[in-house]
Amino acid sequence: YRDQTADELRDALKRAEADPAIRVAVLTGAGRAFGSGYDLSTLAPGEVPELERVLEVHFNPLVREMRASRLPIVTQVNGPCAGAAVGIALAGDVIIAARSAYFYEPFVGIALVPDAGNALFRPRLVGRGRATPAMLLGDRLSAEEALAWGMVWRVVDDAMLADETDAVAARLAERTPGAVAATKRLIVAATDNGMGEQLDLERDLQGEAGRTPEMKAAIAAFLARRKG
């Protein structure tokens, strides 16, 4: 993901919300992955990323827009989902994953902290006991494991993912729009209490982490691997 990606997603969602004929939104990835997290390859050698600004201006507004949208958002996780993409996926209302998909949060491994709502949504979905070691150790979580943990609603064979998503989206579109929007609002109000403060805290701590020597070394190692 790049800054532009988050901005384009938010703009697309706003356009959909403004069209009364649209009753549901589907979010998926282009290509093999759902999302690979923030694109560190955009950084120059030795550059210190302004992660507070990245989150405040680009990614946190997207998460807020998704949760506040009148539209039910179906997240179609079509492949690997890493870093900030996990938070964006979990910000959806109905999450359907391909059987080959997995979820991966490498933040701590590169001297960063979870962001884009990760530290809010994942503990509330799976519980602190499962979320804490998963985030600290950065182990990959398969789609089947995510289903068992309650992170996703349904897992389907890769070949059936598009058809299943379309069928669910069609069912949602048949519902009364006002009732759907009000129900989503009730659920978000019940589960996202303190989301604004949480996103702000993620932003601040990520900014601090992004200025540490460990993070600089992690970025240098990543860029070196890319060149190699």
Ranges and model annotations:
Residues 1-28, 46, 64:
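Conserved CoA-thioester-binding segment of acyl-CoA-metabolizing enzymes
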Residues 5-9, 58, 161, 202:
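Hydrophobic alpha-helical membrane-association signature
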Residues 220-228:
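Terminal low-complexity tails and localization/encapsulation signals of metabolic enzymes
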Residues 184-193:
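Short, charged, surface-exposed hinge/linker loops at domain edges
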Residues 64-180, 204-212, 217:
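Crotonase-fold acyl-CoA enzyme core
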Residues 25, 54, 180-182, 195-199, ...:
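Short, hydrophobic secondary-structure boundary micro-motifs
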Residues 1, 29-65, 81, 109, ...:
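Glycine- (often His-adjacent) and acidic-residue-rich active-site loop
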Residues 8-9, 27, 39, 72, ...:
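Terminal peptide-recognition signature
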